């Protein structure tokens, strides 16, 4: 299992990014969570097979149709997750 922390910057709030990411994560079988940050970015932790995590990271670099992703910072992290949660702001 691979676990990554993502910090996603750009026009990523108010564009259905979190809900879209939750749906994509469930489609790919990725666990973790996603939430908005006060600075206007989106933060997520994703966990799954190397292939599934890579696919979700690739999706995050594009985002949903109304988003404009400028940057995605990745770092390895630890934890155990079950399901994918859209957290409150």
From Swiss-Prot:
Gene3D superfamilies noted in UniProt: 3.30.70.100
Domain Acylphosphatase-like intervals: 3-88
Annotated PROSITE patterns: ACYLPHOSPHATASE_1, ACYLPHOSPHATASE_2, ACYLPHOSPHATASE_3
First-tier enzyme category under EC: hydrolase
Keywords, ordered alphabetically: Hydrolase
Active site as annotated: 18, 36
Reactions accelerated catalytically: an acyl phosphate + H2O = a carboxylate + phosphate + H(+)
Annotated EC: 3.6.1.7
InterPro entries: Acylphosphatase, Acylphosphatase-like_dom, Acylphosphatase-like_dom_sf, Acylphosphatase_CS
UniProt GO molecular function: acylphosphatase activity
Stretch forming the signal peptide: none
A Pfam family the protein falls into: Acylphosphatase
Family indicated by similarity: Belongs to the acylphosphatase family.
Alphabetized PANTHER family for the sequence: ACYLPHOSPHATASE (PTHR47268:SF4)
Protein name: Acylphosphatase
Species name: Thiobacillus denitrificans (strain ATCC 25259 / T1)
Protein's gene: acyP
